[in-house]
Amino acid sequence: MAEKQQAVTEFYNNTSPRGAWEFLLGDHLHEGFYDPGTTATISGSQAAAARMIDEALRFANIYDDPSKKPKNMLDIGCGVGGTCVHVAKQYGIQCKGITLSPEEVKCAQGIAKAQGLEEKVSFDVGDALNLPYKDGTFDLVLTIECIEHVQDKEKFIREMIRVAAPGAPIVILSYAHRNLSPSAESLKPDEKKVLKKICDNLALSCLCSSADFVRWLTQLPAEDIKTADWTQNTSPFFPLLMKETFTWKGFTSLLMKGGWTAIKELLALRMMSKAADDGLLKFVAITCRKSK
């Protein structure tokens, strides 16, 4: 477990703080949300990444209504703080982010300070499987493209539920593999091989299915569980990624700021694009509320 955590920490220490993908995503370390069939553009990529956050909150019925919106939020796997900064600015919610990477925390603190949000946003170094917060601390618990790095996803979700206040919404955005057919016990060997290559290059532990997420949540104090397949909403990102990273600006940004780690990430993202086209890889949204 410690070895896996160290690999994830080094992965993000080596890529995100130095901005290997900054030219494409800005302060966000996740894909954007697009209308299906849209042609993604470099000029709109950062707005699409911010829209992903807004769509996640909308999916969880978070309203910009002072009487209904959460007072505070926890972002697990916060990266360089883009989600926390966006939510604090757009919704006025007090935000806390947590990540394994000390370098990401330093970068996130700098971004929050530059936005004048030191009083609204803060960041901790910590483990998602052992969150350093009391039970029922947060009115909203969110994670975007983080749980893929964790082997024990059920424990990750238990921790999300634990630190959520009664009735608080919980939101998970994650890559996942396709759901199995009723007669299948596992993915096909060639599918497993593809996913292993992707996971190895991105410091991911493994991928599960959206059905797995639902199964784990039904065993916990969670209600109003719902899922959505957003694969078509993220797929426009991949052609843009391939186009822009092979420009001089894109390639030098990857090579100079991210080095070999970022190049491996690019290769994995190319495999992800094909796996999504083949129906093997999905981008899923899951939300629920902690039972009162």
UniProtKB/Swiss-Prot annotation:
Q: What is its EC number?
A: 2.1.1.392
Query: Which GO biological-process labels does this protein carry?
Result: alkaloid metabolic process; methylation
Q: Which keywords fit this entry according to its UniProt record? A: Alkaloid metabolism, Membrane, Methyltransferase, S-adenosyl-L-methionine, Transferase, Vacuole
Q: What's the main place this protein lives?
A: membrane
Q: How does activity depend on pH?
A: Optimum pH is 7.5.
Q: Which GO terms describe its molecular function?
A: S-adenosylmethionine-dependent methyltransferase activity
Q: Which CDD domains match?
A: AdoMet_MTases
The subcellular localization recorded is: Vacuole membrane
Tell me the route in metabolism or biology where this protein functions: Alkaloid biosynthesis; ajmaline biosynthesis
Where, by residue number, is the motif Vacuolar targeting signal?
A: 135-141
Q: In which tissues is it expressed?
A: Mainly expressed in mature roots and, to a lesser extent, in leaves, stems and flowers.
Region entry SAM motif III, spans? 161-170
* Reactions performed catalytically: norajmaline + S-adenosyl-L-methionine = ajmaline + S-adenosyl-L-homocysteine + H(+); 4-methylnorajmaline + S-adenosyl-L-methionine = 4-methylajmaline + S-adenosyl-L-homocysteine + H(+)
What's the top EC group for this one? Answer: transferase
Q: Where is this region: SAM motif II?
A: 134-142
The UniProt annotation puts the region (SAM motif I) at 71-80
Record flagged with keyword Signal:
no
Described by its record, this protein's role is as follows:
N-methyltransferase involved in the biosynthesis of ajmaline-type monoterpenoid indole alkaloids (MIAs) natural products, important plant-derived pharmaceuticals used in the therapy of heart disorders. Catalyzes the indole N-methylation of norajmaline to produce ajmaline. Also able, with a lower efficiency, to mediates the conversion of 4-methylnorajmaline to 4-methylajmaline.
Q: Supply the name of the protein.
A: Norajmaline N-methyltransferase
Q: In which organism is this protein found?
A: Rauvolfia serpentina
Gene name of the record: NNMT
